Amino acid sequence: MRDQREEEENLLEDEEQIELLLEEANAYGLRIEVEQWAIQLLKEDPNLSRLEAYVQAYNEWIK
């Protein structure tokens, strides 16, 4: 039970971080590009975490 709660909290934190990345990308007018890039990364590597995919996509587009 405790592990499940911790996992849910971690997932929520990841989603919050992803949203912050997307908001920052939006400030550059690149939210859609970052989102699409992250989705492509996840298709290419299903073992990649959602957060890591969005971080990589953000870093690729926001240089």
Language-model segment annotations:
Residues 2-63:
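C-terminal alpha-helical interaction appendages
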